UniProtKB/Swiss-Prot annotation:
One of its GO terms (biological process) is cobalamin biosynthetic process. InterPro entries: Nict_dMeBzImd_PRibTrfase, Nict_dMeBzImd_PRibTrfase_bact, Nict_dMeBzImd_PRibTrfase_N, Nict_dMeBzImd_PRibTrfase_sf. This is Nicotinate-nucleotide--dimethylbenzimidazole phosphoribosyltransferase. Keywords: Cobalamin biosynthesis, Glycosyltransferase, Transferase. One of its GO terms (molecular function) is nicotinate-nucleotide-dimethylbenzimidazole phosphoribosyltransferase activity. It is an enzyme of class 2 (transferase). Pfam families: DBI_PRT (PF02277). The active site is at 318 (proton acceptor). The gene is cobT. Its EC number is 2.4.2.21.
Length: 353
């Protein structure tokens, strides 16, 4: 708990002086004011996060965190649980969607096991921070103990901080866990106050009957566990997952170290809800990479006040949408740092300037 507390205490407000200076620079670059739209706003936000008016976000890191879920016993996913570990090995070999997109944007992929049912220790560059061999079935009792929930969040903090010596200019969240949209929907329902049906989607492709069953399982989990919406660790422990907790830790650690953090889809969004519940100020450091096709994602983004950068109908997870969004944030920072001012370029300004 000390690691978590210290991390939260380090998260300060955005650097308003840097943001004002960044806005002034944006207005003096060789373009009509506001002509680069959200790229200008992103550049200013990056300055608020980093405290630097001119900065580059070249060292990009995607944190893909994996775990299994006891609630998968209820049949809420089309895929068997062994796919979680199989996909981790696919990540390690560089053959997954996130690996391809990361190569395209020049990002490193860090893969972490915090709770799969298999032994992944010693496999290539996979990092093992295993808390347990999968969560328990939240439909019949708590997914984990409160101590395990804290351990999950702290594991995410430790994972990001372990990468700092290699350099992390910007980070993105990613997930892997068969059945993990089920706890994500439960978390979203509890922390946004929305009905289960409004925040629950088809996940890996459930039909109507499967979706109805999934909603029923979530309602049963909420009735059995009665998670306290005022206590994010209680919510995580009762209806969450180990990778969701660890992703919340990655988000908190990024903010504590003044690193822009790009949030992926629905599962990462559930982690963002937990992180904001633990430290409301962390919200200012988060950038929504995209809007997932999962219906609960739009609900939680609205609750967090985040406007997604992309809307491509994606619902893969793994950090794929965040990876693409990360390239836009890096481009925004580069524009602000490298584009010439009117004076530098010897270009006349608009007459009303």
């Amino acid at each position: 708990m000390d690691v978590l507390r210290r991390t939260i205490e380090r998260i300060g407000p955005l650097d308003q002086a840097a943001m004002r200076a960044a806005r002034e620079r944006q207005d003096d670059l060789t373009k009509p004011r506001g002509s680069l739209g959200r790229l200008e706003d992103l550049g200013v936000l990056v300055s608020g996060i980093t405290g630097q008016v001119k900065t580059r976000l070249d060292r990009k890191t995607v944190f893909v965190i994996a775990a299994d879920h006891g609630v998968a016993e209820e049949g809420t996913s089309l895929y068997p649980q062994e796919v979680t570990t199989q996909m981790m090995f696919n990540f390690e070999r560089g053959g997954a969607g996130i690996n391809v997109l990361a190569r395209q944007v020049g990002a490193r992929v860090v893969v972490v096991d915090v709770g799969t049912k298999s032994d992944t220790g010693g496999v290539g560059n996979l990092i093992s921070k295993k808390i347990a061999a999968g969560s328990k079935n939240m439909a019949v009792g708590p997914a984990m103990s409160r101590a395990e929930a804290v351990a999950a969040v702290q594991a995410g903090i430790e994972v990001l901080e372990a990468e700092l010596p290699r350099g992390v200019d910007i980070a993105a969240t990613g997930d892997m866990g068969i059945g993990n949209t089920t706890p994500s929907s439960a978390i979203c329902s509890v922390l946004t106050g929305k009905p289960v049906e409004e925040v629950t989607g088809r996940g890996t492709g459930l039909d109507d009957a499967g979706l109805a069953k999934k909603c029923a399982v979530i309602r049963r989990a909420l009735a059995v566990n009665r998670p306290d919406p005022a206590d994010p660790l209680d919510v995580l422990a009762k209806v969450g997952g180990f990778e969701i907790g660890a992703l919340a830790g990655v988000i908190l650690a990024a903010a504590a170290h003044r690193i822009p953090i790009v949030i992926d889809g629905f599962v990462s969004g559930a982690a963002a809800l937990i992180a904001v519940g633990l430290a409301p100020q962390v919200r200012d450091y988060m950038i929504a990479g995209h809007l997932s096709a999962e219906p609960g994602h739009a609900v939680l983004l609205a609750h967090l006040g985040l406007d997604p950068l992309l809307c491509l109908g994606m619902r893969l997870g793994e950090g794929t949408g965040a990876c693409l969004g990360m390239s836009l944030v890096a481009a925004a920072a580069a524009i602000q740092a490298e584009m010439a001012t009117f004076q530098d370029a010897g270009v006349s300004q608009a007459k009303n300037d």
